[in-house]
Amino acid sequence: MKVLLLGTGDAIGTPKIGCDCPQCRHAQETGTGRLRTSLLIEEGGRHILVDTSPDLRQQLLRAGSPHIDAVLWTHGHYDHFMGFGEFYRVQKCPPVYAAEPVLRYCGGTFRFLEFEHHPVEPYVPFDLFGIRITPFLVRHPPAYTCGFVFEAHGSRVGYTSDTNRDIPEKSLDLLKDLDLLLLDALVPSHTRIVKHMNYLDACTLAESLHPKEFRCIHVSHVMPWEYPHLAEDGNVFEYV
């Protein structure tokens, strides 16, 4: 199982349009910005795309234009699903897996694009291409939001998507002792946002869950680049 981070940024991305902060200047000068958060999971030549960001065309071209065998949506915020329109005239009827409220909301936006609807239930595992996938609930008010745990070859990877600190205990149980934990960490530790975790929240949670590896995703342009544990676009993790 190969996990490729297509994007690690927040809804705005880095650099932010019109911003001259140190992080955005660094991104412009070095070409190391952050596209909107999304990941690509490969197993046995099949590809699962987790969230379809507005940067999807650029992300898939960078990844070598893989055929997408399944799409997973976490929730109905535009930076996590609006790029789905990039499948138009590229790939017919892609299969999409998501919780019923998410399928209903996101699917209503893409009436011009036919796709397979596959509702999934939180905490009910399903299998795709040799990967066991378990959706779990997180708290990202007011959006109904799920994360996913991916398991193959005895390795487990957890992806929270967007969430605040109040993750249900049943979900936390699934996230213990992972090989890789990908956690929302939108802003530095001194900033508090109701529907997201900050850097300290993410690091504290990761410490309590004991993953072998931990990375912060969904990172905003105000996060200093030098902080430890920050994921970067193009990071790859392989489990065989």
Mark where each language-model region is.
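Conserved beta-strand hairpin/beta-sheet module of binuclear metal-dependent hydrolase folds
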Residues: 1-59, 144-161, 180
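Active-site metal-binding loops of divalent metal-dependent hydrolases
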Residues: 8-9, 52-54, 76, 138-140, ...
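Glycine/Thr-rich phosphate-binding loops of Rossmann-like dinucleotide-binding domains
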Residues: 13, 58, 81-82, 106, ...
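Active-site metal-binding motif and surrounding structural segment of the metallo-beta-lactamase
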Residues: 45-98, 179-180
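Short, hydrophobic beta-strand segments that form beta-sheet elements in well-ordered domains
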Residues: 47-51, 71, 95-99, 117, ...
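Short loop/helix-cap segments at secondary-structure boundaries that form the rim of catalytic
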Residues: 63, 87, 106-110, 126-128, ...
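Metallo-beta-lactamase
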Residues: 93-146, 152-153, 231-233, 237
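Cap/insert and terminal regions of metallo-dependent hydrolase folds
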Residues: 165-240
